[in-house]
Every structure is written in C-alpha cells, then in structure tokens.
Amino acid sequence: MAWAPLLLTLLSLLTASLGASVTLTCTLSSGYSNYKVDWYQQRPGKGPRFVMRVGTGGIVGSKGDGIPDRFSVLGSGLNRYLTIKNIQEEDESDYHCGADHGSGSNFV
C-alpha cells in the first residue's frame, strides 16, 4: 500500500477578543489519523515554545513548562485542536503544529 506524504494544514490567521475563546485546527493528510501532533507557541522575536502533544485521545504526556490550564487539546479523526479559553494579551503569538513521522518532521 502506498502512502501519501504527510501534510499538515493550519489556518493562517485568526483573531480573538480578550476574554474570548478560540480553537485552532491542525489537519493531517488522509492516512495519518493515528499520528500525534505537537503544538508550539512562538512570540515575536522568540523561539518556538512547546505547548503540548495531542493524539486522537487528547493530550499525550504533559503540557509545556508554564502553559496555563486555559490551554487544552483534543484529537478527532484527522484533526488536532488547540483551544485557548479566556484569551489574554500574553497569548498573542504565532501557533504552529508539527508531526514527527519517523523519516523527518513536518511543521506549519
């Protein structure tokens, strides 16, 4: 059976008001529904910061250091969701998802 290359898709721009909730979606390509995805937060001028890993059953392992309980994840089918509740100013960042598939890593 031939496998298609792993492709991750992430919405490129999302805005939210302070105190609101937002959900980011990272979508895996067909055939990769069992893969785990790592979420990262990257503030301007800083390196990526690990948020947490998510599989089909939800969080895998622990949240990254200092990640508040307002951040949560969920996995369903090909989608891996990162939800941030009660948005705060310090949450303003670029968010990336990445998957390690054995022969390398893909990030968006």
Regions found by a protein language model. Name each.
Residues M1-V108:
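Extracellular domains of the immunoglobulin superfamily
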